Amino acid sequence: MRRLLLAGILRRASSSPSSHHHLHLVRALSASSPLPASDADLRKYAGYALLLLGCGAATYYSFPLPPDALHKKAVPFKYAPLPDDLHAVSNWSATHEVHTRVLLQPDSLPVLHDALAAAHGERRKLRPLGSGLSPNGLALSRAGMVNLALMDKVLDVDAKKKTVTVQAGIRVAELVDTLREHGLTLQNFASIREQQVGGIIQVGAHGTGARLPPIDEQVISMKLVTPAKGTIELSREKDPDLFYLARCGLGGLGVVAEVTLQCVERHQLIEHTFVSSADEVKKNHKKWLSENKHIKYLWIPYTDTVVVVQCNPPSRWRTPKFTSKYGKDEAIQHVRDLYRESLKKYRTKAESNDPEVDQLSFTELRDRLLALDPLDKDHVIRINKAEAEYWKKSEGYRMGWSDEILGFDCGGQQWVSETCFPAGTLAKPNMKDLDYIEELLQLIEKEDIPAPAPIEQRWTACSRSPMSPASSSQEDDIFSWVGIIMYLPTSDARQRKEITEEFFNYRSKTQTNLWDGYSAYEHWAKIEVPKDKDELTELLARLRKRFPVDAYNKARMELDPNKVLSNAKLEKLFPVTEVQHVK
């Protein structure tokens, strides 16, 4: 090879006027007579230079530029705009997005029925979308979706029975506004109010309160529009097995078109927020679970701070002191100061004087702080400590209607993984819920995970829906729900990718170290399908241990044999073999 390369250089050199000079130089370099070290080095590097010149000349003559190359203007690359008939649909945190040409919005039950019948006949996809808020994009399908946003009417309110019948496209916030006029409300609420009713029951959403079940338990009856069997009515009396299976059906058994919900009288709650420690929580946990209608803990990693939030109906005998020790500005001022200091460290001094900082809420400030360096553990710890101090200064009481009190500002866009696991009974909690948290916090510190706050822990009673993560045949069983997060406080694609990779590392470590030991299973709206085949096989085996997968797939094949309602995520979580399909 060396001889060939040398011969090529000699041929190229022979075409130039100085070829004889170069030839003598090469001969000198290839001479076998011993030379002093310094002269040898000099001639070695001269040879490298000659080799480089030869390669450059070869490249120039082999790949010549066009004659007008110097006169052409650079044209920046532009993405082609989306066609007018292509809809972009993403979830709340913009972590999952699809583009589709088929996004139907029927405005009545007959139109929905006809759309599904046509899709069934033509073997086309038509995945029920809901509000599309699920963190894992469970409802998204580029092949086609149906959204019931135009089917949002309240059909009937029975004040005596305290029930309401609605079209499934109505949003929770709109339903609550209507129920208010009748002195009614929903029994419990998830953190946000923008979900459609059909979606919130299909994924097994929940609020908090060890005596209160997930929201699917509030469903008394429903109308399910299926591709193969049309519109069917389900209730505890009419086909109870399918009714319970379809209440938390993940949109795979049919499109929920109408729902009758059990309501409760509209009521006020007093919320008590205070800061505790892990030891204090352990001492009082059993009592707090049984005494409080609604309760949750917000754990702050790398601190000994636990924010306890208790909500109960007002008492005739005891009126709490509603005035807080600190005003809102006082409670948040140290967070503003930290942000300004961090701006000086990470950016410029001028930006730290931005008057807009004083108008930001705590969650907005937290997002901006994290955006500066979201994966630096020490930076995240400083933010977590500032959050602990914020909650300490925000201790106190507030009173309002239940739908107002039970909401929660989750912060900005984020990755989230929430698991559900048994925690004993209300009469006899097994304390594994606190063991889980203790192990989780130790894992975070051991692995140096830049885990932001909070780790939210809630409780519910059990559900009779077999596909619910809180499913149980024992009525007094309780379940704990624990959510870990990483915020996506930036629009920078590279930074979001890095946060995403770190989050899945965080989630993987919790899965490996905790899930099996506590029989923990992810919320259906937050479960992510592994890309690795072995990991997917392991996940499918875990799901079979907990859920009636065969019964669910059998119902799918009866109601939707052409898989009109399925998407890639559902197909991977609940694969149906050809033999099962034929049966």
Swiss-Prot record:
The main place the protein resides is: mitochondrion
- Reactions that this protein is recorded to catalyse: L-galactono-1,4-lactone + 4 Fe(III)-[cytochrome c] = L-dehydroascorbate + 4 Fe(II)-[cytochrome c] + 5 H(+)
State the needed cofactors, names only.
FAD
TM segment ranges? 45-61
The organism sits in which domain of life?
Eukaryota
For this UniProt record, give its keywords in alphabetical order, as a comma-separated list: Membrane, Mitochondrion, Oxidoreductase, Transit peptide, Transmembrane, Transmembrane helix
Annotated InterPro entries: ALO_C, FAD-bd_PCMH, FAD-bd_PCMH-like_sf, FAD-bd_PCMH_sub1, FAD-bd_PCMH_sub2, FAD_lactone_oxidase-like, GL_DH, Oxid_FAD_bind_N
This protein is called L-galactono-1,4-lactone dehydrogenase 2, mitochondrial
Source lineage: Eukaryota, Viridiplantae, Streptophyta, Embryophyta, Tracheophyta
Q: Which gene encodes it?
A: GLDH2
